[in-house]
Amino acid sequence: MKHFDHIVFDVDGTLADTEESVLSSLAQIIQEETGKTLPRHELDFALGIPGKDALEKLEIYSQATLDRWCQVAASFKSTISVFPGLLEVIATLADSGCKLGIVSSRARNEYAKEIAPLGFDKYFEHIILIEDTTEHKPAPAPMLEYLRRAGANPGNVVYVGDTVYDEQCATSAGVSFARAAWGSHQDIPNATYNLKTPNDLLTLTTK
């Protein structure tokens, strides 16, 4: 296995188990906007893409609706947690000198309210969020922005994520991709690596 100097993480479904928060709040918004109750599996597409894009696909986007979704999602904050064992592995990687980053489709205010309190920000030198680029996953722009800020060679970087959008973003930017099987519900045939547990992250670096 190739060893990398930089390990970059997606947030939702990779670092943090946010599925209940995202999908339950989205279901509530759809109910409010349309009066319909959609089956949970029909909402899975919203995992890993910007909220605006999800609402546009559902044909219910407005800034007010997006703001309302953020408000409702915050009420599910107690359901969000770091995947078991992951914080310890991240600390080990950071202590060993591996450079860690985040590339996420979350907005900065959502991240600050729901994700930052989980306590892993101190390990990440660069955190790329939706406001940092004009194009978003699956486009390569967010990863390219990480590479620019970190001064990193794409060949020395691996992106860990849970969706096809993550893989497409990484591949388009010339970066290797590792599927976080502990949070992924998707088959990702083009993944370079398939990590079954957080401990498998330690195999990605010699540092």
Spans of features found by a protein language model:
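Residue-level marker of alpha-helix boundaries and capping positions
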Residues: 42, 80, 102, 156-158
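Conserved G/P- and acidic residue-centered "switch" motifs that form tight phosphate/ATP-binding loops
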Residues: 14, 104, 162
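Well-ordered alpha-helical segments embedded in enzymatic catalytic cores
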Residues: 85-89, 142-145
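N-terminal helical cap/lid subdomain that shapes the substrate entry/recognition surface
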Residues: 2-88, 94-96
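Hydrophobic residues in well-ordered beta-strands that form the structural core
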Residues: 17, 102-104, 179
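Substrate-recognition element of Asp-dependent hydrolases with the DxDx(T/V) motif
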Residues: 26, 89-115
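Asp-based, Mg2+/Mn2+-dependent phosphohydrolase catalytic module
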Residues: 1-5, 94, 108, 112-207
